[in-house]
C-alpha cells in the first residue's frame, strides 16, 4: 500500500479510492493518510455487504421482498458491527416499536440470530432462494454504480467519523453515506439510541488503539 497508493494519486490525481481489503476500516484510514486525498474521496466498502445480507435475512424472516425491508448494519466491519434495531422498519413501521425487546436476549422473535448470521456469513457467501449472492464483488459494483451514474444513493460505507456521535479520534467506521460522482458527499446523521451510540464509540476506541501505533503515515 505504501508504494501503490502514492502512485495511484500521482497518475490519477482526481481519483476516488474504494478500499475493500480487510481489516477494511483500518486500511481505509491508512489509504487516506498515505494518499493525502480529501476524506470524501477515500471510501471503505465497510458494512455495505453486511447491510445487504441483513436485509435479505430480514426479508426471509418476514416474507417481504428485501428491497422493502429497511435496516442498517453500522460501525466497524468486524465482530462488533452494530445492528441498528431502532431503525429497522417496513413501510415506515418500526419493528422495535411493535417488539420493544427486538435484538435483545429476551426477544421472543429471536432477531439476535439474524445479526449473528450476518456476522458469521461475512466469511462465506449466503445463498438465498431466488436471489443472486451478494458477494463482495457485487457489493463493490453497487458502490461504483452509485458514483459512476451520479445516483446519490445512500450506502453504509466506511468514512472518517471524527466529530460524529462524540467520537474524537480519526477513525473510519460505516455510517449511511451519500455516494455520487463527487465521491462521498455527506453522512446521514441517524438518530441512534444511547446504547447504539455507546457501541459505535466502543468500535472507535478499538480501532484507534490499533491505529495509534501505526508508524510512517
From Swiss-Prot:
Organism annotation: Oryctolagus cuniculus (Rabbit)
Pfam families in alphabetical order: Ldh_1_C, Ldh_1_N
Matching InterPro entries: L-lactate/malate_DH, L-lactate_DH_AS, Lactate/malate_DH_C, Lactate/malate_DH_N, Lactate_DH/Glyco_Ohase_4_C, NAD(P)-bd_dom_sf
Entry annotated with the keyword NAD: yes
Residue positions, PTM Phosphotyrosine: 123
Similarity field: Belongs to the LDH/MDH superfamily. LDH family.
Identification of the protein by name: L-lactate dehydrogenase B chain
Swiss-Prot/TrEMBL keywords: Acetylation, Cytoplasm, Membrane, Mitochondrion, Mitochondrion inner membrane, NAD, Oxidoreductase, Phosphoprotein
Protein's pathway: Fermentation; pyruvate fermentation to lactate; (S)-lactate from pyruvate: step 1/1
Gene Ontology CC: mitochondrial inner membrane
Record function comment: Interconverts simultaneously and stereospecifically pyruvate and lactate with concomitant interconversion of NADH and NAD(+).
Record EC number: 1.1.1.27
Amino acid at each position: 500500500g505504501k508504494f501503490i497508493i502514492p502512485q495511484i494519486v500521482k497518475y490519477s490525481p482526481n481519483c476516488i479510492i474504494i478500499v475493500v481489503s480487510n481489516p477494511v476500516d483500518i486500511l481505509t484510514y491508512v489509504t487516506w493518510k498515505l494518499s493525502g486525498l480529501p476524506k470524501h474521496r477515500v471510501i471503505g466498502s465497510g458494512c455495505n455487504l453486511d447491510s445487504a445480507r441483513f436485509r435479505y435475512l430480514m426479508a426471509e424472516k418476514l416474507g417481504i421482498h428485501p428491497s422493502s425491508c429497511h435496516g442498517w448494519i453500522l460501525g466497524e466491519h468486524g465482530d462488533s458491527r452494530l445492528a441498528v434495531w431502532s431503525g429497522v422498519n417496513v413501510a415506515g413501521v418500526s419493528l422495535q416499536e411493535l417488539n420493544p425487546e427486538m435484538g435483545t436476549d429476551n426477544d421472543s422473535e429471536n432477531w439476535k440470530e439474524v445479526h449473528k448470521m450476518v456476522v458469521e456469513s461475512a466469511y462465506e457467501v449466503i445463498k438465498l432462494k431466488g436471489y443472486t449472492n451478494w458477494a463482495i464483488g457485487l457489493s463493490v459494483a453497487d458502490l461504483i454504480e452509485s458514483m459512476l451514474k451520479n445516483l446519490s444513493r445512500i450506502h453504509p460505507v466506511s468514512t472518517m467519523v471524527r466529530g460524529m456521535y462524540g467520537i474524537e479520534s480519526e477513525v473510519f467506521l460505516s455510517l449511511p453515506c451519500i455516494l455520487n460522482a463527487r465521491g462521498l458527499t455527506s453522512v446521514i446523521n441517524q438518530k441512534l439510541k444511547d446504547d447504539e451510540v455507546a457501541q459505535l464509540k466502543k468500535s472507535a476506541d478499538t480501532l484507534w488503539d490499533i491505529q495509534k501505533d501505526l508508524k510512517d503515515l
